[in-house]
Amino acid sequence: SREWIYVKDHCEALLKVFKKGKIGEFYNIGSNKNLNNLEICKSLIKIAKSIITIGPNVKIQFVKDRPGHDIRYALNSKKILKKLKWKTSIEFKKGLEKTFLWYLHNNNYYKSISKKDIVKRLGTK
């Protein structure tokens, strides 16, 4: 599983650390919202169906994990909550919907990434 956080919440946490954090201290920025990739895929399909027309036969394709894949990515973000009084403000599913809409309306951003760059990142041929 992975810990998911909406980008605006993350930015607000960074600003809080810059303004109120103690120099030399570290602050883990987390949401305490751990979901696995399958849960994310199912949520995205549900969001997509509510916004755009997609076929009834949407299927999730399972692929082999990459070498060295970690089973869980999670943070202990108690310190930023306790010391800086910061926590996420956007509910996870709302943040995921906002992210989906951003990509839907800003496709020039990701369409500029070449197939070559994707292959290089994934280490596939």
Where are the regions a protein language model picked out?
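C-terminal substrate-binding subdomain of Rossmann-fold SDR/epimerase-dehydratase oxidoreductases
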Residues: S1-K125
